[in-house]
Amino acid sequence: MERTCLAVILAAGDSTRMKSSKSKVLHPVAGRPMIAHVVEAVASAGISSVALVVGRDAEEVAKAASIAGVGIEACLQKERLGTGHAVLAAREAIAKGYDDILVTYGDVPLQTDGPLKAARQGLADGSDIVVIGFHTDRPTGYGRLLVKDGELIAIREEKDATDAERTVTWCNSGLMAINGRKALDLLQRIGNANAKGEFYLTDLVEIARSLGGRVTAVDAPEIEMTGCNTRAELAVIERFWQERRRHQLMLSGVTMIAPETVFLSYDTVIGQDALIEPNVVFGPGAVIDSGAVIHAFSHIEGAHVSQGATVGPFARLRPGADLGNGSKVGNFCEVKNGRIGEGAKVNHLTYIGDAVIGAGSNIGAGTITCNYDGVNKSETVIGENAFIGSNSSLVAPVTIGDGAYIASGSVITADVPADALALGRARQEIKPGRASLLRERALATKAAKKAKG
């Protein structure tokens, strides 16, 4: 579509029903502020210019809305005098002369580009106003879209509707597109002669028709038009978002054994033929390649799992974790800023932080990379095909050469050459009969305490 477009996103509400110390549009859905989801939808509709109408937490909202490729102009709404007044807070941006003006809301994070594109197409086809509506089997409380001969003749609010009009199930979402060349003139004609003394954007339908303009409506899925005002509604939106994204991934070839227990982030990438077991949580920045297996109760954030690698169960991958092809991070392991080479194994009860592990190496149970001295982080480097015995502590900075062996229970503080065996533990001593003496002494002490009372 060659037409220019400005999206006006209304995000200046006081968010009183959210009962929060911050604006509701800053609350996350799938690990991302809901306002950013709205900007992403706008960008997907081919719109690169946004007038963001802000009020509460203006700077934070503008920052959260910033995504690559979209120019954001923040417009402060000092008073809350209705939706029509809110759009006019972006007067200067609108006056720049766009073909289309698209009005949407910062608290509707499930919207996608489809209805937005359809509304813009309606303008291209000659409409002056295009309202986005949705069909619902629960229309009570919504304004009804009344259509005749293909044109929208009115938006009838519930309190003003006749019994016949209340049977209409096509409802107003609040989103609309406006002919950019006529937008300012139409918006400035909105009056406030109503009980609340506010300026309502919906009045544009009547105004445009009174001037001989054409007004139409397009449809959107009800779920996409779900707004968020309370914590309960936020939970519903999160559920809807997760269900939609899980379904998309499964259709793309990802296996989820119990999808309702898997939680994704806005940018989670999972390749074809990956297997995700129950109760897995993906934080932002997780990339799972094809054929990888994520076992149950794992948490992955800011990490990359390569083809054929396995994670978990009960594993945690933190930012900077990078697992090579066919590698393994097993149960009760944590990896942070660590690269696990191809085919390397970190099977259980291990912490790998600020480390590089070469291909084919084996890290025994209970191994710890001691990467922090209380002030600075240091790196541990383990070569290829090395063997780290169980319950070893590798005190960084330290390098273990290719093919080296570390004996179980060792504390390694110095570099170990390739193919060397390193032992860093006290020599075992055996004292025959000593256990019996110790046991007798302990029992005597216990009896003496009991006798005293």
From Swiss-Prot:
The record's listing under PROSITE patterns reads: HEXAPEP_TRANSFERASES (PS00101)
Where is this protein found? Cytoplasm
Residue numbers binding Mg(2+):
D107, N229
MF-aspect GO terms: glucosamine-1-phosphate N-acetyltransferase activity; magnesium ion binding; UDP-N-acetylglucosamine diphosphorylase activity
Q: How is the cofactor bound?
A: Binds 1 Mg(2+) ion per subunit.
Region entry Linker, spans: 232-252
Q: Where does UDP-N-acetyl-alpha-D-glucosamine bind?
A: 10-13, 24, 77, 82-83, 105-107, 143, 157, 172, 229, 318, 336, 351, 362
Instruction: State the residue spans of region: Pyrophosphorylase.
Output: 1-231
Q: Which reaction does it catalyse?
A: alpha-D-glucosamine 1-phosphate + acetyl-CoA = N-acetyl-alpha-D-glucosamine 1-phosphate + CoA + H(+); N-acetyl-alpha-D-glucosamine 1-phosphate + UTP + H(+) = UDP-N-acetyl-alpha-D-glucosamine + diphosphate
Enzyme Commission number, as recorded: 2.7.7.23, 2.3.1.157
Single biological process term from Gene Ontology? cell wall organization
As cofactor, the record names: Mg(2+)
List the keywords (alphabetical).
Answer: Acyltransferase, Cell shape, Cell wall biogenesis/degradation, Cytoplasm, Magnesium, Metal-binding, Multifunctional enzyme, Nucleotidyltransferase, Peptidoglycan synthesis, Repeat, Transferase
Q: Where does acetyl-CoA bind?
A: A365, N371, Y372, S390, S408, R425
Q: Where is this region: N-acetyltransferase?
A: 253-453
Can you name a GO cellular component term? cytoplasm
InterPro entries attached to this UniProt entry: Bifunctional_GlmU (IPR005882), GlmU-like (IPR050065), GlmU_C_LbH (IPR038009), Hexapep (IPR001451), Hexapep_transf_CS (IPR018357), MobA-like_NTP_Trfase (IPR025877), Nucleotide-diphossugar_trans (IPR029044), Trimer_LpxA-like_sf (IPR011004)
Q: What pathway, per the record?
A: Nucleotide-sugar biosynthesis; UDP-N-acetyl-alpha-D-glucosamine biosynthesis; N-acetyl-alpha-D-glucosamine 1-phosphate from alpha-D-glucosamine 6-phosphate (route II): step 2/2; Nucleotide-sugar biosynthesis; UDP-N-acetyl-alpha-D-glucosamine biosynthesis; UDP-N-acetyl-alpha-D-glucosamine from N-acetyl-alpha-D-glucosamine 1-phosphate: step 1/1; Bacterial outer membrane biogenesis; LPS lipid A biosynthesis
Q: Does the keyword Nucleus apply?
A: no
Q: Describe the protein's quaternary organization and the partners it interacts with.
A: Homotrimer.
What is the protein's known function? Catalyzes the last two sequential reactions in the de novo biosynthetic pathway for UDP-N-acetylglucosamine (UDP-GlcNAc). The C-terminal domain catalyzes the transfer of acetyl group from acetyl coenzyme A to glucosamine-1-phosphate (GlcN-1-P) to produce N-acetylglucosamine-1-phosphate (GlcNAc-1-P), which is converted into UDP-GlcNAc by the transfer of uridine 5-monophosphate (from uridine 5-triphosphate), a reaction catalyzed by the N-terminal domain.
Q: Which NCBIfam families match?
A: glmU, PRK14353.1
Name recorded for this polypeptide: Bifunctional protein GlmU
The organism named in the record is Rhizobium leguminosarum bv. trifolii (strain WSM2304)
**Lineage, please?**
Bacteria, Pseudomonadati, Pseudomonadota, Alphaproteobacteria, Hyphomicrobiales
